[in-house]
C-alpha cells in the first residue's frame, strides 16, 4: 500500500459532531486520511455514514478508514480498518480483508509497534504522545523521545496520536512521525477546514527541521 510522501493528516470523526459534514470540512482542509470512529453508533448508522463519506474521500484523493469495525469496512468498500490492541490481530484481519486494503494498529510502546509491523500492519498509530482528554483515565503520555525511538525502528509509517495540537504538530513530525491523527485539534475549531489547513502547514514545516 502506497502512502503519500508528504506528512499525513488523519482526522478522526468526533462523536459529538455530524460525521459526514465534519468529514467534508476536514477533507477540504487537506486531510489525507479520514477515519470514522464511533464506539456507540449502530451498525446501520456506521454503514450509512461510511457510504456517504467514501465518495468524499475519493473526490479529495484521500483514504477512508473505519475504526474497529472490520465488517463495516468490508461491507462499504472502505480503504481499510484501524484496530486496537484488544481487536482482531492484524494477521486475522488480513485474511479477511485481502492484500490490498489498509490495516492500521493502535500501539503505545515500541514492542507493540514492532509486533504490529511483524503481523502485517500497514501503519501504526503511536501514542498518546502528549496529555489528552479524549480517553477515560489515560496512561501517562509516551512523549516525543519514545516516538523518535520507535519511528527509527519501523519500516512502516508511524502516525502519532494523542494530545496533538497546532502548537506541537511540527515537533512531532520533526521527531520522525509520518503523520498525525487528531480529533479535537480540528473538531473543536470554529472552522474545521481552517484547522486542518493549519495543521498541514505545520507538518510541512516540521519536515524541514
From Swiss-Prot:
4-amino-2-methyl-5-(diphosphooxymethyl)pyrimidine binds at residues 35-39, 67, 106, 135. Its EC number is 2.5.1.3. Keywords: Magnesium, Metal-binding, Thiamine biosynthesis, Transferase. Pfam families: TMP-TENI. CDD domains: TMP_TenI. The keyword Transferase applies. GO terms for biological process: thiamine biosynthetic process; thiamine diphosphate biosynthetic process. Its cofactor is Mg(2+). Pathway: Cofactor biosynthesis; thiamine diphosphate biosynthesis; thiamine phosphate from 4-amino-2-methyl-5-diphosphomethylpyrimidine and 4-methyl-5-(2-phosphoethyl)-thiazole: step 1/1. One of its GO terms (cellular component) is cytoplasm. The keyword NAD does not apply. 2-[(2R,5Z)-2-carboxy-4-methylthiazol-5(2H)-ylidene]ethyl phosphate binds at residues 132-134, 163, 183-184. Mg(2+) binds at residues 68, 87. It catalyses: 2-[(2R,5Z)-2-carboxy-4-methylthiazol-5(2H)-ylidene]ethyl phosphate + 4-amino-2-methyl-5-(diphosphooxymethyl)pyrimidine + 2 H(+) = thiamine phosphate + CO2 + diphosphate; 2-(2-carboxy-4-methylthiazol-5-yl)ethyl phosphate + 4-amino-2-methyl-5-(diphosphooxymethyl)pyrimidine + 2 H(+) = thiamine phosphate + CO2 + diphosphate; 4-methyl-5-(2-phosphooxyethyl)-thiazole + 4-amino-2-methyl-5-(diphosphooxymethyl)pyrimidine + H(+) = thiamine phosphate + diphosphate. Binds 1 Mg(2+) ion per subunit. Belongs to the thiamine-phosphate synthase family. Condenses 4-methyl-5-(beta-hydroxyethyl)thiazole monophosphate (THZ-P) and 2-methyl-4-amino-5-hydroxymethyl pyrimidine pyrophosphate (HMP-PP) to form thiamine monophosphate (TMP). This is Thiamine-phosphate synthase. It comes from Chlorobium phaeovibrioides (strain DSM 265 / 1930). The lineage of its organism: Bacteria, Pseudomonadati, Chlorobiota, Chlorobiia, Chlorobiales. The gene is thiE.
